[in-house]
Amino acid sequence: MKDNGAELTATVHYLLFYEVVDGYAEKRAPFREQHLKYARQAFERGELVLAGALAEPLDGAVLVFRGPTPHFAEAFAKGDPYVINGLIKSWRVRKCMTVIPSEQS
């Protein structure tokens, strides 16, 4: 990847986008602890970099995964208590070429 002729080093991340159901804030309560535990485990394994809900309106979430393939993000979604219990209308994974910060900085 080049920026004004200079070589940039990119780190591959995968973004997991969730679209949540109407009434998500209320409906998630019974599954929230399970979901957070599941996310913490992925973080502790070094797969999940950061995660959070999209606010105003609360209509989705974004989770950032590291790795050479979308495997960790896809596997996370398939096993997430929010997905399993119908709180997520849809999810998708997109590759992101991160240049700032780079892992070399």
Predicted regions and their residues:
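Conserved, structured core segments of small domains
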Residues: 1-105
